[in-house]
């Protein structure tokens, strides 16, 4: 885990910006499930030379609506402008950004370690229990363990297993839920209620096309 990220968990975003550091933000984007949208969103970040630390896509509680969960380290001003730019994309319904304190989030990690090391060393088994790891595949030559938690927790288990010949490691992107959100279903109903209705409205300019559109 990088030192700047360790510090980012101990100070508020405004404090980090004052000392010249970029705080971590989680951007949640609600979209329609359309081909090519991921590429268009990625271009927004690449054009601004902003590195994406984590990216996850998944369905939501609303049928046909998907969500992107994007983690970056940037100033709030930059993140706010990014969300506005993302919302201009066709098929994007809404974009939100939150600090770590405003979300509930987790990451999953898989660890492949030699089975002999686990069987012969009680300390390894104790380590795995401490981190809440569970076996998902057990073979003669290796065992795969899975654990879920925050970045510092999954990183901690990596360092703990390295002396025992860890073969492979992989971590998922972040998944997150906004604490104060009532869900996108309620937001969608609000948008629908404010959408244009079928009622005809008289417009005084409709019958004056030549006057209105002539310079």
Question: Where on the chain are the PLM-derived regions?
Answer:
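Long, contiguous binding/interaction regions
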Residues: 2-66, 71-215
């Amino acid at each position: 885990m990088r030192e700047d990220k360790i510090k980012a968990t101990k100070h508020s975003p405004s404090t980090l910006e004052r000392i010249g550091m970029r705080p971590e933000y989680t951007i949640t984007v609600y979209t329609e499930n359309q081909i090519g949208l991921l590429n268009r969103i990625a271009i927004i970040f690449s054009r601004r030379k902003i590195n994406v630390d984590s990216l996850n896509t998944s369905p939501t509680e609303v049928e046909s609506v998907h969500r992107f969960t994007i983690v970056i380290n940037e100033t709030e001003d930059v993140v706010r402008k990014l969300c506005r730019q993302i919302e201009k994309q066709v098929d994007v319904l809404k974009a939100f950004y939150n600090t770590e304190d405003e979300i509930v989030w987790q990451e999953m990690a898989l660890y492949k370690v030699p089975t002999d090391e686990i069987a012969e060393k009680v300390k390894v088994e104790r380590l795995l229990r401490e981190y809440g790891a569970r076996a998902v595949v057990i073979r003669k030559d290796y065992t795969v363990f899975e654990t879920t938690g925050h970045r510092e927790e999954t990183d901690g288990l990596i360092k703990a297993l390295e002396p025992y010949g860890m073969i492979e490691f992989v971590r998922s992107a972040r998944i997150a839920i906004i604490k104060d959100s009532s869900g996108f279903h309620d937001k969608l109903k609000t948008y629908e209620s404010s959408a244009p209705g079928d009622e005809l409205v008289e417009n005084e300019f409709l019958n004056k096309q030549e006057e209105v559109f002539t310079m």
